[in-house]
A protein has these predicted regions:
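Rossmann-like NAD(P)-binding element
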Residues: 62, 67-102
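NAD(P)+-binding Rossmann beta1-loop-alpha1 motif at the extreme N-terminus of oxidoreductases
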Residues: 2-66, 72, 76
Length: 102
């Protein structure tokens, strides 16, 4: 088994969170879905349209308009919102995420 195969298997078993499904967030989420088809993707976005598209296109497995307990399952979380919102979302995530989450 090659290193790339081992890495792909590892990343396929992980859960990724995306806070923000704009151009950057949705692009990264789509890239993860293409590369790691069996991974789990949790997504937050205020726009219902963006959430519905992510679910419809099978980019996200779960999409919500609030930072909720599902983010506690994430191994990695990507903050893809305008910088001025990051502090707020980090505070929301702090009490939910597991200690090993990056």
């Amino acid at each position: 088994m090659t290193y790339d195969t081992l890495l792909t298997e590892k990343f396929n078993k992980m859960t990724y969170g995306f806070v923000g499904l704009g151009l950057i967030g949705s692009s990264i989420a789509k890239a993860f879905r293409r590369a790691y088809k069996d991974c789990r993707i949790i997504a937050f976005n205020r726009s219902e349209h963006a959430r519905m598209l992510a679910l419809q296109d099978k980019v996200a497995d779960y999409a919500t308009d609030s930072i909720d307990e599902h983010f506690g399952e994430c191994d990695y979380i990507f903050l893809c919102t305008p910088v001025e919102y990051n502090e707020y979302y980090l505070r929301e995530l702090k009490s939910i995420i597991k200690p090993s989450c990056i």
